[in-house]
């Protein structure tokens, strides 16, 4: 799915999902022909749910990255 489709499916703002992507929290695959980022639907929906729950619990983005096993770049 595209990031726009994830926005519609989750209700999370585009800018927030883009930030999660840039931070490495939301993995994607990039289509070579048009450079569109594609996200795996189920994996992405689950990851967004996890991130939202951790944010609601007061966790910072660096803490979430550590908890989810995302390496710092």
Please annotate each region the language model reported.
Residues 2-8, 22-34, 38-73:
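Arg/Lys-rich, alpha-helical DNA-contact motif
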Residues 13-16:
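Short coil turns linking two alpha-helices in DNA-binding domains
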């Amino acid at each position: 799915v595209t990031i726009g489709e994830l926005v519609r499916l989750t209700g999370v703002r585009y800018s927030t999902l883009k930030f999660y992507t840039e931070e490495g929290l939301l993995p994607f695959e990039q289509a070579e022909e048009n450079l569109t980022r594609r996200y795996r639907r189920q994996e992405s929906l689950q990851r967004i749910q996890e991130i939202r729950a951790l944010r609601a619990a007061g966790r910072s983005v660096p803490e979430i990255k550590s908890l989810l096993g995302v390496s710092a770049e």
